[in-house]
Amino acid sequence: MIGTRQYIVADHLFLVKADETILACMTNYEPFFTDKADITDALFALTVMQGAPVSYIEEWSQDEEGQETICGHTEDGSPVFEYRFGGKTAGWLVCTPGYRDGTLHLSGFQSKSALDNSLMIQFAMASACMGTVLFHAAVVSLDGRGYMFLGKSGTGKSTHARLWLENIPGTELMNDDNPAVRVKPDGTAVVYGTPWSGKTPCYRNVSAPLGGIVLLSQAPYNKIVPLKGIGAYAAVVPSISGKRWDSRIADGLHETENALASNIPVWHLDCLPDTDAANLCKDTIAL
């Protein structure tokens, strides 16, 4: 039986239409479920079905720890994303040019991973021109404000967040891997928990004003410095998901990235994975 579910993430509504067996697997989305929204206001809709391979022209690919995402387009220009795990395809996402509608064709292998990836991609692309970005980051809250930790994979974002949780009373984990940030018209920003997290399952429907952004680097010492202008912008951009060779999306991302770099405190923390690093960071940024 086919069903439709509505979810709200970062104040954006989206719809998922799929077989009930697929919908039953979406437990990480339950905190974001709603049945009271006006579906005409939906940011996007995704239809999930079993399907045959999709023919497309490849544009770009990314392989991270055996999880490969290949991006391209069909002959008529529709965006396509293929997901491979260990070299085996899990599914193909085909979207309309504005990403408002998408269809995920499942192969029957790693279906939940293909679904999660599709919803992340469609969310990031469809919201890019609405002041919203999806970060690769860990985020904690303290005293009503959110603090994001950025860095390359393996830098220790989750470790630094854990050190805050263990050593700074009142700290809560908002998301471990993929928080969303939305910039308001007045330049302020709000960070949100999402249904997408990393090795730590943290699927919380929470939000907080964004109090600061910290770029982490491993070092044999602890030192934190503020970043301004181009330095702040360069620290923020690599952690934001987006299809930057699409000019419409790139322009939307740039506007949001510039607003964040200009209006939100950004810091660079060289650090050890220790308590002193967490305390130094907190004492500097959480004023």
Regions found by a protein language model. Give the residues of each.
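A noncatalytic interaction/capping subdomain that flanks phosphate/NTP-handling catalytic cores
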Residues: 1-148, 153, 163-172, 180-287
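Hydrophobic positions on the alpha1 helix immediately C-terminal to the Walker A/P-loop
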Residues: 160
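Conserved glycine(s) of the Walker
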Residues: 156
